Each structure stands twice: as C-alpha cells, then as structure tokens.
C-alpha cells in the first residue's frame, strides 16, 4: 500500500485497489473510455477524478514527467496492476495502440 500524493486520506495497492483511510472502505472505480477512474478529495478539499493507472504508477514509482503517459503492457485498460504499467512518450503510446489494433 502507498499513500497517494496530494490525497493523504487514501492508499492504493499495486493492483489499483483504493482505500479510504478515514473509514477503511474500498472505493469502487467507474469506467470512462475504457479506463478505470476514481473520484478522490484532495488535501485542499477539492474532488478530482483520476485514472487509476496513473495513481498506481505515481504512488509506487514516482512522478510522471510532462509529456509521458502510462501504457498498459497487455493492452487491457482495466488491468492496473503495477507490473502491467510502464511509462512511455505520447508518440510511443500512439504507435503501441495502433499496433495492438491490427
């Protein structure tokens, strides 16, 4: 488990499970354009929607630099396990997506 930066009341597992630390409950993600997303309240009290793949990556491996995206290695946008995620450039991600469609 790792605390989500900027969201001290939440932890996230390597598999993408998000826990609310105030009540101990698991948050249920929703799907948007094939991606698993979750709404969290940040440390300033603002509610924000995030892709779970980005939260998993950043909580366990660090900040994603500008211009980079998180790719699902197996192409399954619902598989947010850390072992299935890698950082790629936007151009690399576009090539990977077009390759997977063939």
Give the role of each language-model region:
Residues 1-69, 74-102:
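Conserved recognition-core residues within compact binding domains
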